[in-house]
């Protein structure tokens, strides 16, 4: 949940739901035990999850344990989940693992050898629709 995006919504007819919890100003997010309790009762068709890093050992990871727990719950409560991660974060291990690579569908901007360990992946190139790759690849969302 990136609270900075709230200022970018141009249409006041768009409904936005914000979960309660602890505000984390360094990453513009809301997380913590209250957020986790609310998310445990929510279910999603599709989820798009961000990450601070991606490595073979640390999987999809983040600097904050509350963020890692939130990502895990959203992933587990979604019919489909996609991790959005730019290529600069490959090979990066931050403090807390959120997800294993083999349980993730990754969407990124450049190919990296770690993508072969993902459940599926898509490389989105500027100006063209992403193409699914890997075992069990999902169609472009």
Predicted regions and their residues:
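Conserved phosphate- and dinucleotide-binding cores of soluble alpha/beta proteins
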Residues: 4-136, 141
């Amino acid at each position: 949940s990136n609270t900075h995006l709230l200022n970018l919504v141009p249409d006041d007819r768009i409904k936005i739901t914000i979960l309660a919890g602890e505000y984390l100003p360094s990453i513009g997010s809301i997380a913590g035990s209250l957020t986790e309790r609310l998310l445990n009762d929510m279910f999603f068709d599709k989820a798009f999850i961000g990450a601070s890093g991606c490595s073979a050992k640390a999987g999809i990871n983040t600097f904050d344990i509350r963020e890692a727990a939130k990502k895990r719950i959203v992933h587990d409560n979604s019919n489909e989940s996609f991790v959005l991660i730019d290529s600069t974060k490959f090979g990066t291990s931050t403090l807390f693992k959120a997800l294993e690579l083999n349980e993730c569908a990754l969407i990124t901007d450049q190919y990296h050898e770690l993508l072969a360990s993902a459940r599926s992946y898509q490389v989105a190139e500027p100006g063209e629709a992403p193409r699914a790759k890997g075992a069990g690849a999902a169609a472009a969302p």
